């Protein structure tokens, strides 16, 4: 069982096949997704990889987290996640997992936070049918109707589907096909829709209900940075010199 990656949703577009058919795809960007720590059976009771992505401001990182990043010799990460793996799929700490960790044609499961819709009624939130348009119904056409029984049970049960907040839930969409990868730009194109807004964080892992292709790299596709050093950050360009008039 291999590790997954954390990506950022860019948006949706479409690509064309050789036969001229268009395929709707979601573009996911993997940017400096590095292994931050290992979880081992001896120390933690299970085997997993902790990966991080993005660049966090030092002022927003706690002192304890800064110490862990220093041990791993990686820059402070904005988003962290753990992926359960087998012992033969451990990737060295500090290594950067690239977009070609997944291959075109394989299926993946993606997890994200759905778009928030605010307060919603029963028809929008739960697809209720509403009440009749006429025949005695005046201003309750979109209401949910009764919420319980009569004297027995004499209450509304917990988890009854009612109006309330819609969205902002952790959702996993399974068996999305990888259409294309672009390791140079760190892009993964998956067929179909992915939960969440553009710019949201998405976790991508091998599909649990599909067999992993034999061509998939094991333990994964990654590049090790020299001496576990953090990736170089381009310095800000110097301001052009301004000549002063005498």
Curated annotation (Swiss-Prot):
* Gene Ontology molecular function: any one: rRNA binding
Q: What are the recorded Gene Ontology BP terms?
A: translation
Q: What does this protein do?
A: One of the primary rRNA binding proteins, it binds directly near the 3'-end of the 23S rRNA, where it nucleates assembly of the 50S subunit.
**Modification N5-methylglutamine, positions:** 151
- Report disulfide bridges, numbered on this chain: none
Region feature (Disordered)? 140-162
The entry sums up its family as follows: Belongs to the universal ribosomal protein uL3 family.
Record's protein name: Large ribosomal subunit protein uL3
| Gene name in the database record | rplC
Cross-referenced SUPFAM superfamilies: Translation proteins (SSF50447)
Organism of derivation? Methylobacterium sp. (strain 4-46)
Give the GO cellular component terms, alphabetically.
cytosolic large ribosomal subunit
The record's note on quaternary structure and interaction partners says:
Part of the 50S ribosomal subunit. Forms a cluster with proteins L14 and L19.
Alphabetical keyword list: Methylation, Ribonucleoprotein, Ribosomal protein, RNA-binding, rRNA-binding
Instruction: Please give the InterPro entries that the UniProt record associates with this protein.
Output: Ribosomal_uL3, Ribosomal_uL3_bac/org-type, Ribosomal_uL3_CS, Transl_B-barrel_sf
Q: Which Gene3D superfamilies match?
A: 3.30.160.810, Translation factors
**Modifications the protein undergoes after translation, according to the UniProt entry:** Methylated by PrmB.
């Amino acid at each position: 069982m291999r590790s997954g990656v954390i990506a950022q949703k860019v948006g949706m577009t479409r690509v064309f096949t050789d036969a001229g058919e268009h395929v709707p795809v979601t573009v996911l960007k993997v940017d400096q997704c590095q292994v931050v720590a290992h979880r081992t059976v001896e120390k933690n009771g299970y085997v997993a990889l902790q990966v991080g992505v993005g660049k966090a401001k030092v002022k927003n990182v706690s002192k304890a987290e800064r110490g862990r990043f220093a041990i791993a010799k990686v820059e402070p990460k904005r988003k962290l996640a753990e992926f359960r793996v087998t012992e033969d799929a451990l990737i060295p700490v500090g290594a950067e997992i690239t977009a070609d960790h997944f291959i075109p044609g394989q299926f993946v499961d993606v997890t994200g936070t759905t778009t928030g819709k605010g307060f919603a009624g029963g028809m929008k939130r739960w697809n209720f049918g509403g009440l009749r348009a006429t025949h005695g119904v005046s201003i309750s056409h979109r209401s949910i109707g009764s919420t319980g029984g009569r004297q027995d049970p004499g209450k509304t049960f917990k988890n009854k589907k009612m109006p309330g907040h819609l969205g902002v839930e952790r959702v996993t969409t399974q068996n999305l096909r990888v259409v294309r990868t672009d390791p140079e730009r760190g892009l993964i194109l998956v067929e179909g829709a992915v939960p969440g807004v553009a710019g949201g964080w998405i976790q991508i892992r091998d599909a649990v209900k599909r067999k992993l292709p034999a061509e998939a790299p094991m333990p994964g596709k990654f590049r090790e940075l020299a001496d576990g050093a953090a990736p170089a950050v381009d310095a800000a360009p110097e301001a052009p010199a301004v000549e002063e008039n005498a």
